[in-house]
């Protein structure tokens, strides 16, 4: 009996994988996903990941060289982009104290000298999961809009967009992007659209929704017109910031993360619709990215109810808010899965 138990323990010890210490490789991490993709015959149809992310801060030294202002470029080289860096405002909680091993592990993942590291890493997870095409977004830079120094946001967004186009999009046709717009500076926003709209792999432009700018401000109208003329969509990419005054009432990260991603896009969508942007720019496609889906029917009902009681407050609208919302596009991550056990589905 004791011998059998010891043998079982020895086998368990041999099979144990220490993910924190072993050499990290995306292909190993996603081995099961690759097998599932084969079984499910993903190669038989087109799959597009419309909200994929990379960690642009790992290439921050390269991005910094694209900053026009020499003083700010020197500052970026010196400070970097980590906590306390050029734009950061707080700590990181999403890796759950290191228990999500991909965050620290991917930094040490070995890749060939070419193509660019980000292209290799993107390709590995795309191939493993059966994804044909991916729309790449930054990750830490989603909170660049919270930077109190507007010139820093402008400089870094231009540098990042130039680096992304030169190093990534020009080199791999499977990777696309909606480029970052420095929304705190309307003129710079327009300039970026003019500069990058025709670059290879650019399929639209993106606003990070943690900003505190009114999207109905007339200063942005020429940017919206430029996008509509080119048939390029405008995305509002959700994020969170614990510095938001309402979210500061949350004492746990789970509350900030659950509410923040939906709340910011609920606010901007309300302003977008009630100020008649869908009527002013009827051919401009809008996307609401990574804020989930559960809030959409709630917003439809709520805005329609208000609209029917005070239609005069939305003089530009010719239809109910929900009608405009049905013509918009949405992405969700994660899939907002709930308990599907029999007791909940019967």
Where are these regions (language model features)?
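Helix-coil boundary/capping segments in enzymes
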Residues: 1-346
